Amino acid sequence: MALVSAVPLDSRLCLCRTLFGLTHELKAIRRTIPNLGMCRGGKSIAPSMSMSSTTFVSSEDGVPRRIGGHHSNLWDDDSIDSLSTSYEAPSYRERADRLIGEVKDMFHLISVEDGVSTSPLNDLHHRLWMVDSVERLGIDRHFKNETNAGLDHVYSYWTEKGIGRGRESGATDLNSTALGLRTLRLHGYMVSSHVLDHFKNEKGQFTCSAIQTEGEIRDVLNLFRASLIAFPGEKIMDAAEIFSTMYLKDALQKIPPSGLSQEIEYLLEFGWHTNLPRMETRMYIDVFGEDTTFETPYLIRERLLELAKLEFNIFHSLVKRELQSLSRWWKDYGFPEITFSRHRHVEYYTLAACIANDPKHSAFRLGFAKICHMVTILDDIYDTFGTMEELELLTAAFKRWDPSSIECLPDYMKGVYMAVYDNINETAREAQKIQGWDIVSYARKSWEALFDAHMQEAKWISSGYLPTFEEYLENGKVSFGSRLTTLEPMLTLGFPLPPRILQEIDFPSNFNELICAILRLRGDTQCYKADRARGEEASSVSCYMKDHPGITEEDAVNQINALVNNLTKELNSELLRPDSGVPISYKKFYFDIWRVFHYGYKYRDGFSVASIEIKNLVTITVVETVPL
């Protein structure tokens, strides 16, 4: 939401000029953007954690403005230039490719009836373990065919009671059934959660032995992982989550520090919805191979682990080049001079890398980082820095879709406008190579919707109007900006998105509505106090309290969190239902972007205070390599 200011602007007609000279003009603009002193000499100052009050400043143009007190950019050029490129030598890629071939051979040996590496007493669990391992180690993109073949085999033996460890093992097995339920669901197989009923006692409760063995703990750990892939109305999954959570927390008090305890702590902390793939890979590399309850040949574990480490480290050389490119873009459009705003382009790139580490997805990673950064800058302009008159000019200028429209704008807005304009055209050129159609008008409409939603919030502040919860949420689903940060980068991926599929996954489809609603609600529960301190009264919390007189703030937050949990189960169902007509792989990128933002709001507004959890995420996933 925006600062409401009645500062008059010169309203005379803006004379639109040609594109000639705009490049020179942008350089001049960077020298005249209001400087509020958040950075000194191009260096970051110590981050400020205070988000509790509004700061009023008088900028160089003499207009009193608000700033949010956000800490400055944490990652300067020196940080980026210091990143390792020691694994870009061709020999590492050649070694990784040889290992990929060896692992494919291992998949083949498992698929052979009565093969030397498996038996009919454990072949189902072995297949599931292989699929689960390559996914958690971040190398699954190399083994799509092997994964599909393995899961087809497991599914052919699936029963209403689940499965045993092998096709001839006789009795069903909790570990194999829970891992199978989770893995098969995530790959679009129709499997019922009622298989878990067969692991409850006559009282309808999950049971455990008096002595917690490592094998039983791992059984329950996979039960916990499965319980998170829940659909609406699945009470058995709720019961499984409650039981397994209590069991694992109790186990942590009894077992010594180990790879198993580290894995339990990690999964209890991040579950599925805030568990980013590359972040999990970094954890799993450290603990992989310590499971002594399942007899897998040492050679298989050794090869999988070596390949995972190589792929993790090889990616770092690409990261450095992409971050250097991103930093040049950030400086070329004069963003460092916009000192009143948050600068989180490196953090956004990291989040993209955590869900898309395939080298060929460079356009996705950079596109996501750029769009998120621009949406953040615009959010800070509309929320605090801009006057109402300036915001109206910016919104109107964008809808004219003419670079000469920047003549009408205050200097600090001109570079932002050109960054958005150029980025849409650049993305459109990349997308057209893949999609075969011009996405400019499609992208413009989504940007226009964002500008309109921000303006609506600004008008609410201007008039002192507090909307109803429903009214606020309908607008907030758009103003959050998640559609934009998803749509354009998605269109640069290497698969076509025809209109039929876009209608199923883009806003306002039910799938995308759920994503937008959850993120708006989750973001509000973490941001509403800081927003209110900056003069932004309307949030899902305050609007819910308006609709329910007498309810406390704490109860309102709890009700919204409960709503988020219910909507999340609906989202699970929308993502994984086999009858949707849209491949899960298409929806998975949308869903993973949702997980990225969900992670960012897990503890606080991690995009405003990025110096804690997300800073650590940058360090462990894109800065540091793993020892071979």
UniProtKB/Swiss-Prot annotation:
GO terms for biological process: diterpenoid biosynthetic process; green leaf volatile biosynthetic process; terpenoid biosynthetic process. It is found in: Plastid, Chloroplast. It comes from the Eukaryota. Mg(2+) 3 binds at D531. Keywords: Chloroplast, Lyase, Magnesium, Metal-binding, Plastid, Transit peptide. Gene3D superfamilies: Farnesyl Diphosphate Synthase, Terpene synthase, N-terminal domain. Binds 3 Mg(2+) or Mn(2+) ions per subunit. Its cofactor is Mg(2+); Mn(2+). InterPro entries: Isoprenoid_synthase_dom_sf, Terpene_cyclase-like_1_C, Terpene_cyclase_plant_C1, Terpene_synth_N, Terpene_synth_N_sf, Terpene_synthase-like, Terpene_synthase_metal-bd, Terpenoid_cyclase/PrenylTrfase. Pathway: Terpene metabolism; oleoresin biosynthesis; Secondary metabolite biosynthesis; terpenoid biosynthesis. A motif (DDXXD motif) lies at residues 379-383. Mg(2+) 1 binds at D379, D383. The keyword Transmembrane does not apply. Monoterpene synthase (TPS) involved in the biosynthesis of monoterpene natural products included in conifer oleoresin secretions and volatile emissions; these compounds contribute to biotic and abiotic stress defense against herbivores and pathogens. The Asp-Asp-Xaa-Xaa-Asp/Glu (DDXXD/E) motif is important for the catalytic activity, presumably through binding to Mg(2+). This is Monoterpene synthase like 2, chloroplastic. The lineage of its organism: Eukaryota, Viridiplantae, Streptophyta, Embryophyta, Tracheophyta.
